[in-house]
Swiss-Prot record:
Lineage: Eukaryota, Metazoa, Chordata, Craniata, Vertebrata
ABC transporter domain boundaries: 423-646, 1212-1445
Domain ABC transmembrane type-1, first and last residues per copy: 81-365, 860-1156
Name of the protein in question: Cystic fibrosis transmembrane conductance regulator
Residues annotated to bind ATP 1: W401, G458, S459, T460, G461, A462, G463, K464, T465, Q493
Length: 1482
């Protein structure tokens, strides 16, 4: 960044904002980059501002029982705030004084007033000077107030972030991420621009008092008639505002529903295309859009009336003020013009400035109170440790997650001791405690010596992570004692990657030691990965390490924990995303050898780890089920250990399967498990299979696929239970992860639409607490096409050389946390870490965009012509009035009456030509109430245009090829449907209306002035030319600065969420100061852009006003010097010229707003112009209930005989198939050729990333493909894409359940009757599940069907395939996380319902693969082998490597017995448990 010219700028340059000229010039000539932005002044740095406010807040906390944040803010900013307020007031006073001078100038043209005529020129100079003074006072004052507002926001941003890092886990459990984002964006945005309006809460009343005093002098009591009308108008506007909010609240729920479905569609677009559901999804979304648009129109109409009321009020205010006085006493002409000028100022003060100021104070004080409450939340307490302690001891420890339970426990215990109450009372006390919440850990005891390994095992929700949290001090024990040295290192269950390089992630602020670093890299198997990157370990990782695989992230997290020199290492399931061989090697080399002399606590469920541990602690429902050695486990719990050992390949199971088996075993053998379960508990568990509610609702804030929902989900049907998920959670079900009331769930939890342009946004579905965010994994299943070849680790299954035994920790490092962070952090690096893709849109909206926008709906052009016709009619009326004035005698005393002092005065009477003249002045102010006949059709039509654009964009996205969609971020696509459509619906119609309204007022006023005094037209031409040139000059830079500012917001919120995700790691490593510094750097980056935007905006506003001041000076002196005796002419010219001043500036700002908002239209057009998938029929196939063919999803084909249906057998022939993700990309699959006989089952084999799932996608033509595939003799080139895809039934790896009823999810086209759906539900074992829910098939699933287990969701997919009657079934790891029961159901259904179908299976379970007749082995993008299992096992192959010799002995007899045509019977559950899973995930 460049040094700011502001630092060396002169007073003159600062006053006129001339120091911004270099950046304006550069922005006009070329595209601005981040390096072009100026550094912020030191006074605006987040460090200084936060330190200042933090000092005052600490002082407030120390001095008072009831601290107020507003007092701390007052001590920091009050005097500057008041100084600029006084400047603002003085600027506003000049507006009140201007009409006085105008009246004197008009009076000087009275033929009998010769005295004042001589000083008219001086009065004109005085009037012009008032405009100059107002310009010099107003702009510095407004800029100063914006600047203070910015500083207040920065200081509070920083204070809140520091508080977040200190919050206790119990508090984090009750705060949703949406609430934090809202706190930082919604509330604090009010300070930035709102502060300039705050002073009008006292300025406006003073202004009104002054104006009423001056009007009283002119009109006496009748002046209050106009004021009364304005007050009534303000109240009406307030009422309309409330009505508008009511409509908008109703509409928010509808928008929410639409965006939920849209986001689910975008997340699962591949499944939507595979199922051919494009039309069904489009119809569903369009139906929701229709309901939303009805409310949008109502809100827009109310807003329109509210806005236009201001424009139309001017005539009535003057009319009501003057008429009573004129009827009673008559009135001279100059009083009319003076009154008009006063009323213009009065109208602005009463109907705009004061209501806005009150709203600003209301919002700001509300925001300050919210922040104040947040800053007083309970903080994380650092436990006291004894550094000399070498052992880790836990004695009788009990803990609760619920806030206050522990304190309650202590208090009640003290009461027990004091009062020595009886046993009966004691039991009463404990029963009361149980009502408050169940303990997450109960009576835990263990002791481990230095250098020992403690393995902690237990089923899901047993309290394993909570145990580690308690050792770290994150969870306070309610009773018991914990003892350890306090020097802790921690590896989280869900790997957390901070933005930065691999090296920085591993070192994490600890001083660098080359030998130690290399040892850790080697032990964690990272050498091969790092060597593949061009930048090695200096490669910058994006948000959440998105470019890495799950295994790479896990190993970097482990390396970070191991690198730190600590006494105690807490490893929370660190091997979850590693394949079996890598896990074994890392466990041996790292945990057992490298860390041999360190105390380690490892959370695991692997038998191999339990055998090697010095001590084992098995938890069940928060209690210690067993503590001792492995041999003691076998002796004391023989049933339990033999049961686990009975699973021959327990270690080979995935973590989810091991947890499932462990849960069942613990349930069977625990003492508590034998007790009878109450009826209520049974009912509560009825949705769960083997204790699982299902796949945990992943709060993937940092994942661009799943982090795109901006609105909370509205639950239509009340759930019969609190859906707290268990599957991956480490806390028991009793723990409530979010205590936000249900009534709040309809709120949109995100800031206004202008807060984010790009970058991450936050989902609010069933508000997740921050603690829940920390204990959920980021979705690791990133599509492989999103990773570059360099960043995808090809896992080698070959054993690597064993590390020599070493203990690198003997090399004690120098003081920790010694990383120097005061140095300047590269902003480009920050941008690379945090920011989303920069949009490729021109700096200024092109004319082509405007023309396309006009052409969207023919009615829009007609409405604009209609507006022009009305405008011409208004001008014609105006000219007719002028003609009447010209022909009437100018000072007809016959129509007047003598005033008291004998001088000739112009009196208004009903017959006077001046009455017409007066009417015209009112007409000129409002141009005959412009809008009711013009504005309403315009607003209505613009909303219709928005409707059409949304429809076209949705259609285009659904029809776009996957190669195009893969290049876009899901969050970016949803932004078009949320933010940009909201702009098209809400902001654009009213902004265009305002601009048209203001522009016509200005043109009308200029036309009138020019007709009255032709010389003024000569002054108008250069002014309009200057305005157009200046606007174009400024617009280039301002739009780029706004874009950069918008991008600058992204790092702030991304860093916030990144910090929350890794908060436990941050605290364990003590890196809070480092992350505060990073946050301040991100804030400073945004501030630099925002401050420069504010400065250039003020430069532009001041230049516009200076041009108008010059114009007004020209008009004044032309009028004074060239007009003969005609006070009416001078009056109307000067009155309109003064009115033009404010109106034209408003029109200029509106034109800039229109240009800015039209960028959203440009982005929408960009999506509408996306290419469509090749081969799609122009006439889409509409399913019909009556049509039997569409009902069974089979189509007549020209290549097949009329009597046949296609496909009939399911024979597939693949010839030279090559697949790419994008046209110019590398081939993912090359020259694949093979054939499959009808009804044959083929298994796909290959390591992770070999291309198995890619091949299935290629069959569905979801990729760019070359070559040919034929099904039953019909080539894919000869039929439409939709017909081709409907030949396949699909069970994808990523299950797609959208928000809707069971019926809609199974049959979105509504083709099948209830009986047919129930029949299929019976076949796949879903009936019992669906019948448990109220409404059965009509029960509404939300949040991706989180109330269903992963197994139930797979059964839903299976049911869809059965209903489709497809002849070819594609299965992509259907049993990845299934419990044994659901897996048996799927196997049975595949054998029965798809007995005659061709099945292509990609699977990791060996037993499942044995059902296949042939296997296709894919290596290095090509087919290596295509044979039967016997041949594959007899040769050296990947399949042979994956199966141990003992397994081969078992498998051959079974395989030989199933060679015959009749397939083997379904394996029983007992047999199923003896299977082996070959886990090859990274």
């Amino acid at each position: 960044m460049q040094r700011s010219p502001l630092e060396k700028a002169s007073v003159f340059s600062k006053l006129f904002f001339s120091w911004t000229r270099p950046i304006l010039r550069k922005g006009y000539r070329q595209r601005l980059e981040l390096s072009d932005i100026y550094q912020i002044p030191s006074a605006d740095s987040a460090d200084n501002l936060s330190e200042k406010l933090e000092r005052e807040w600490d002082r407030e906390l120390a001095s008072k029982k009831n601290p107020k944040l507003i007092n701390a803010l007052r001590r920091c900013f009050f005097w500057r705030f008041m100084f600029y307020g006084i400047l603002l007031y003085l600027g506003e006073v000049t507006k009140a004084v201007q009409p006085l001078l105008l009246g004197r100038i008009i009076a000087s043209y009275d033929p009998d007033n010769k005295v004042e005529r001589s000083i008219a020129i001086y009065l004109g100079i005085g009037l012009c000077l008032l405009f100059i003074v107002r310009t010099l006072l107003l702009h510095p004052a407004i800029f100063g107030l914006h600047h203070i507002g910015m500083q207040m926001r920065i200081a509070m941003f920083s204070l809140i972030y520091k508080k977040i890092l200190k919050l206790s886990s119990r508090v984090l459990d009750k705060i949703s991420i949406g609430q934090l984002v809202s706190l930082l964006s919604n509330n604090l945005n009010k300070f930035d621009e709102g502060l300039a309006l705050a002073h009008f809460v006292w300025i406006a009343p003073l202004q009104v008092t002054l104006l009423m005093g001056l009007l009283w002098e002119l009109l006496q009591a009748s002046a209050f008639c106009g004021l009364g009308f304005l007050i009534v108008l303000a109240l009406v506007q307030a009422g309309l505002g409330r009505m508008m909010m009511k409509y908008r609240d109703q509409r928010a729920g509808k928008i929410n529903e639409r965006l939920v479905i849209t986001s689910e569609m975008i997340e699962n677009i591949q499944s939507v295309k595979a199922y051919c559901w494009e039309e069904a999804m489009e119809k569903m979304i369009e139906n929701l859009r229709q309901t939303e648009l009805k409310l949008t129109r109502k809100a827009a109409y109310v807003r329109y009336f509210n806005s236009s009321a201001f424009f139309f009020s001017g005539f009535f205010v003057v009319f009501l003020s003057v008429l009573p006085y004129a009827l009673i006493k008559g009135i001279i002409l100059r009083k009319i013009f003076t009154t008009i000028s006063f009323c213009i100022v009065l109208r602005m003060a009463v109907t705009r400035q004061f209501p806005w100021a009150v709203q600003t104070w209301y919002d700001s004080l509300g925001a300050i109170n919210k922040i104040q409450d947040f800053l007083q939340k309970q903080e994380y307490k650092t436990l006291e440790y004894n550094l000399t302690t070498t052992e880790v001891v836990m004695e009788n420890v009990t803990a609760f997650w619920e806030e206050g339970i522990g304190e309650l426990f202590e208090k009640a215990k003290q009461n027990n001791d004091n009062r020595k109450i009886s046993n009966g009372d004691n039991s009463l006390f404990f029963s009361n405690l149980a009502l408050l919440g169940a303990p997450v850990l109960k009576d835990i005891n263990f002791k481990i010596e230095r250098g020992q390994l403690l393995a902690v095992a237990g089923s899901t929700g047993a309290g394993k992570t909570s145990l580690l949290m308690m050792i770290m001090g994150e969870l306070e024990p309610s009773e018991g004692k914990i003892k350890h040295s306090g020097r802790i290192s921690f590896c989280s269950q869900f790997s957390w990657i901070m933005p930065g390089t691999i090296k920085e992630n591993i070192i994490f602020g600890v001083s660098y030691d080359e030998y130690r670093y290399r040892s850790v890299i080697k032990a964690c198997q990272l050498e091969e990965d790092i060597s593949k990157f061009a930048e090695k370990d200096n490669i910058v990782l994006g948000e959440g390490g998105i470019t890495l695989s799950g295994g790479q992230r896990a190993r970097i997290s482990l390396a970070r924990a191991v690198y730190k020199d600590a006494d105690l290492y807490l490893l929370d399931s660190p091997f979850g995303y590693l394949d079996v061989l890598t896990e074994k090697e890392i466990f041996e080399s790292c945990v057992c050898k490298l860390m041999a002399n360190k105390t380690r606590i490892l959370v695991t469920s692997k038998m191999e780890h339990l055998k090697k541990a010095d001590k084992i602690l098995i938890l069940h429902e928060g209690s210690s089920y067993f503590y001792g050695t492995f041999s003691e486990l076998q002796n004391l719990r023989p049933d339990f250990s033999s049961k686990l050992m009975g699973f021959d390949s327990f270690d080979q199971f995935s973590a989810e399967r091991r947890n499932s088996i462990l849960t069942e075993t613990l349930r069977r053998f625990s003492l508590e498990g034998d007790a009878a379960v109450s009826r209520n508990e049974t009912k509560k568990q009825s949705f769960k299979q083997t204790g699982e509610i299902g796949e945990k609702r992943k709060n993937s804030i940092l994942n661009p696929i799943n982090s795109i929902r901006k609105f909370s989900v509205v639950q239509k049907t009340p759930l019969p239970m609190n859906g707290i998920d268990e599957e991956d959670s480490e806390e028991p079900v009793e723990r409530r992860l979010s205590l936000v009331p249900d009534s709040e769930q309809g709120e949109a939890i995100l800031p206004r639409s202008n807060v984010f342009n790009t970058g991450p946004t936050f989902q609010g579905r069933r508000r997740q607490s921050v603690l829940n965010l920390m204990t959920h994994s980021v979705n690791q299943g990133q599509n492989i096409h999103r990773k570059t070849a360099a960043s995808t680790r090809k896992m080698s299954l070959a054993p690597q050389a064993n590390l020599t035994e070493m203990d690198i920790y003997s090399r004690r490092l120098s003081q920790e946390s010694s990383l120097e962070i005061s140095e300047e952090i590269n902003e480009e690096y920050l941008k690379e870490c945090f920011c989303d893709d920069v949009e490729n849109i021109p700096a200024v909206t092109t004319w082509n965009t405007y023309l396309r926008y006009l052409a969207v709906n023919k009615s829009l052009s007609l409405v604009l012509i209609w507006c022009l016709v009305i405008f011409l009619a208004e001008v014609a009326i105006s000219l007719a009035v002028l003609l009447l004035l010209d022909k009437s005698p100018r000072y007809s005393k016959g129509n007047g009456t003598a005033s008291g002092n004998g001088s000739s005065a112009v009196i208004i009477t009903s017959t006077s030509s001046y009455y017409l003249f007066y009417i015209y002045v009112g007409v000129a102010d409002t141009l005959l109430a412009l809008g009711f006949f013009r504005g309403l059709p315009l607003v209505h039509t613009l909303i219709t245009v928005s409707k059409i654009l949304h429809h076209r964009m949705l259609h285009s996205v659904l029809r776009a090829p996957m190669s195009t969609l893969n290049m876009l971020k899901a969050g970016g696509i949803l932004n078009r449907f949320s933010k940009d459509i909201a702009i098209l619906d809400d902001l654009l119609p009213l902004t265009i209306f305002d601009f048209v309204q203001l522009l016509l007022i200005v043109i009308g006023a200029v036309a009138v002035v020019s007709v009255l005094q032709p010389y003024i037209f000569l002054a108008t031409v250069p002014v309009i030319a200057a305005f157009v040139i200046l606007r174009g000059y400024f617009l280039h830079t301002s739009q780029q600065l706004k874009q950069l500012e918008s991008e600058g917001r992204s790092p702030i919120f991304t860093h916030l969420v990144t910090s929350l995700k890794g908060l436990w790691t941050l605290r364990a490593f003590g890196r809070q100061p480092y992350f505060e510094t990073l946050f301040h750097k991100a804030l400073n980056l945004h501030t630099a852009n925002w401050f420069l935007y504010l400065s250039t905006l003020r430069w532009f506003q001041m230049r516009i006003e200076m041009i108008f001041v010059v114009f007004f000076i020209a008009v004044t002196f032309i009028s004074i010097l060239t007009t003969g005796e005609g006070e009416g002419t001078v009056g109307i010219i000067l009155t309109l010229a003064m009115n033009i001043m404010g109106t034209l500036q408003w029109a200029v700002n509106s034109s800039i707003d229109v240009d800015s908002l039209m960028r959203s239209v440009s982005r929408v057009f960009k999506f509408i112009d996306m290419p469509t998938e090749e081969g799609r029929s122009t006439k889409s196939i509409k399913p019909s209930k009556d049509c039997q063919l569409s009902k069974v999803m089979i189509f007549e084909n020209l290549h097949v005989k009329k009597d046949d249906i296609w496909p009939s057998g399911g024979q597939m022939t693949v010839k030279d198939l090559t697949a790419r993700y994008i046209d110019s990309g590398n081939a993912i699959l090359e020259n694949i050729s093979f054939s499959i006989s009808p009804g044959q089952r083929v298994g796909l084999l290959g390591r992770t990333g070999a291309g198995k799932s890619t091949l299935l996608s290629a069959f569905l033509r979801l990729l760019n493909t070359e070559g040919d595939i034929q099904i039953d003799g019909v080539s894919w080139d000869s039929i439409t894409l939709q017909q081709w895809r409907k030949a396949f039934g699909v069970i994808p790896q990523k299950v797609f359940i959208f928000s809707g009823t069971f019926r809609k999810n199974l049959d979105p086209y509504e083709q099948w009757s209830d009986q047919e759906i129930w029949k299929v539900a019976d076949e796949v074992g879903l009936r019992s599940v669906i019948e448990q829910f109220p409404g059965k098939l009509d029960f509404v699933l939300v949040d991706g069907g989180y109330v269903l287990s992963h197994g139930h969701k797979q059964l839903m997919c299976l049911a869809r395939s059965v209903l489709s009657k497809a002849k070819i079934l594609l299965l992509d790891e259907p049993s990845a996380h299934l419990d044994p029961i659901t897996y048996q159901i799927i196997r049975r259904t595949l054998k029965q319902a798809f007995a005659d179908c061709t099945v292509i299976l990609c699977e990791h379970r060996i037993e499942a693969m044995l059902e296949c007749q042939r296997f296709l082995v894919i290596e290095e993008n090509k087919v290596r082998q295509y044979d039967s299992i016997q041949k594959l096992l007899s040769e050296k192959s990947l399949f042979r490597q994956a199966i141990s010799p003992s397994d081969r002995m078992k498998l051959f007899p079974r395989r030989n017995s199933s060679k015959h045509k009749s397939r083997s019977p379904i394996t029983a559950l007992k047999e199923e448990t003896e299977e082996e899973v070959q886990e090859t995930r990274l």
